[in-house]
């Protein structure tokens, strides 16, 4: 269940206790998690957060911290992706098969970006850097593709 909760954008407060954002895009997934827990013999308890500023601020900080960590991991993966492209160029591995593999890796980064963006409720600063880095990765792949096609045209 914890994987599904994380996928929803939930934050683990302590063992077995999670904070889940409410609203469109979250409610259906949360209902599914509750049903799955019940079907497995569990007894989920749902509590609404008190509407006081201190609790709201603390929860927002927890969600922001988690999203920043995800964006940092995403940015690190972007760096690894660009390093992989540079390594293939350095090795002269300019093949269509390699291009296909790198296109799949970029698509994985795009999916991951969309996933994090969907659960980034507060628009943390890391999102802007992530968007920029994803564009840079796309440009790097375009340059790699150009090199692959140029290599194919050489006798």
Protein language model features and the residues they cover:
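Glycine-rich, aromatic-bearing surface loops/beta-hairpins
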Residues: 107-155
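Non-transmembrane, amphipathic alpha-helical segments
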Residues: 25, 29, 63-66, 70, ...
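Long, hydrophobic, amphipathic alpha-helical segments used as structural scaffolds
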Residues: 41, 48, 82-89, 93, ...
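Charged/polar low-complexity intrinsically disordered segments, enriched in acidic residues
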Residues: 74-118
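Positively charged, polar, low-complexity stretches
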Residues: 1-86, 137
